[in-house]
């Protein structure tokens, strides 16, 4: 593929993301294709009149389908909004228990057993490290959480999400107790979507974290001793970015000018944006709605079981393919043998074909390595 084509793919994708309009993306693709080929991209012009009429009817059918699909999305949005309201009282109860605002009712026998087993003052109230443990039990999020992050995430009291309408998208809110790391009590992450029904991300915005001096978890300070004989005897300090969950609140940004980014940088940017959205959607769709199951590890086991089922299905498919290959080879061997027998009927000794067994199916469904957000 030529550099011209490569540049058009990435540049137009970036331009469309920045413009926030899918129609711009389609038009850009058409224009570039026309520039490259020098021909219009209207397929209908290349068809015979009869075929063109049939395609026009198919387009009318597609329009009817699109109208129904639009109604489906509208009704689904109303239904989702209804149940989000019904969920809220449950989330409030969860917050109160996790943070020790209320105590669960226990029978006298259970209370006596608790008094014997542990000192209530030593244990404290609520469920310590609830959100930290829940997130660490998820494969996607555990890759982002470093040991340094854990101290700050112990102060996480609640996570909420809500849809936003202008522009379309959703917002995550992380509520923190007073802590020695930063002054913010709420950290937000907002995703602006080009199309809410199909997850096409335009951009993401995060809260600027107000770190206390020397407590920034997204940077590390390197000290280097001066060279011998140097006039400056003080050590040289250098600040570098480091891996941290809190980089999540500094998402990758799309340049406004497409000329500011080359092909390699555009591919890396797209990968980072996909990874960032994966983290956000995991928190929204899995952690918030099933927090206690992630805390206990049950949700992780269910995820692992689903992954194993997928692996088994893939291995069965591989075995079926291997059997088909063996059958095909058997058929070919028989055909070859028949041909040989026909050609060499007078021969007293005929060589028998040797079956070449296909190798057994390998490990299927392996997950690609996940990159950590820098």
From Swiss-Prot:
The record's note on its domains: The acidic domain is probably involved in the interaction with histones.
Gene that produces this protein: NAP1;1
Motif (Nuclear export signal): 47-62
Cellular component annotations (GO), alphabetically ordered: chromatin; cytoplasm; nucleus
Main location: nucleus
Propiece residues: 372-374
Source species: Nicotiana tabacum
Acidic residues: compositionally biased ranges: 299-339
A Pfam family hit: NAP
Residue ranges the record marks as coiled coil: 26-80
Record protein name field: Nucleosome assembly protein 1;1
SUPFAM superfamilies, alphabetized: NAP-like
Bias type Basic residues, positions: 343-355
Modified positions (Cysteine methyl ester) in chain numbering: 371
């Amino acid at each position: 593929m030529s550099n011209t084509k490569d540049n058009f793919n990435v540049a137009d994708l970036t331009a469309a993301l920045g413009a926030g309009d899918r129609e711009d993306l389609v038009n850009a693709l058409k224009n570039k294709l026309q520039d490259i080929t020098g021909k219009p991209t209207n397929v209908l012009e290349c068809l015979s009149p009869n075929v063109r009429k049939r395609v026009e009817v198919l387009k009318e059918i597609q329009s009817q389908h699109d109208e129904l699909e639009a109604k489906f999305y509208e009704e689904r949005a109303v239904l989702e909004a209804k149940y989000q309201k019904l969920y809220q009282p449950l989330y409030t109860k969860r917050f109160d228990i996790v943070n020790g605002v209320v105590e669960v009712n226990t029978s006298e026998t259970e209370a006596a057993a608790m008094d014997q087993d542990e000192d209530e003052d030593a244990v404290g109230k609520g469920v310590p490290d609830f959100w930290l443990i829940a997130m660490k039990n998820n494969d996607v999020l555990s890759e982002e959480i470093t040991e340094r992050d854990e101290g700050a995430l112990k102060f996480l009291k609640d996570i909420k999400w809500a849809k936003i309408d202008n522009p379309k998208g959703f917002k995550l809110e992380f509520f923190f107790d007073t802590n020695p790391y930063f002054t913010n009590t709420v950290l937000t992450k907002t995703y602006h979507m080009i199309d809410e029904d199909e997850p096409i991300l335009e951009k993401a915005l995060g809260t600027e974290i107000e770190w206390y001096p020397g407590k920034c978890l997204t940077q590390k300070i390197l000290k280097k001793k001066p060279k011998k004989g140097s006039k400056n005897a003080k050590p040289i300090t250098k600040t570098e970015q480091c891996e941290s969950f809190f980089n999540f609140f500094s998402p990758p940004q799309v340049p406004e000018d497409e000329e500011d980014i080359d092909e390699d940088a555009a591919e890396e940017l797209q990968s980072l944006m996909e990874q960032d959205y994966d983290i956000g959607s995991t928190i929204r769709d899995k952690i918030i709605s099933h927090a206690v199951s992630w805390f206990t590890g049950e949700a992780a086991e269910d995820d692992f079981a689903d992954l194993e089922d997928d692996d088994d299905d893939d291995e069965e498919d591989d075995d079926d393919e291997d059997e088909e290959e063996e059958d095909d080879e058997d058929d070919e061997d028989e055909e070859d043998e028949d041909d040989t027998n026909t050609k060499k009927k007078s021969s007293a000794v005929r060589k028998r074909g040797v079956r070449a067994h296909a190798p057994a199916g390998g490990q299927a469904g392996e997950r690609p390595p996940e990159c950590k957000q820098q």
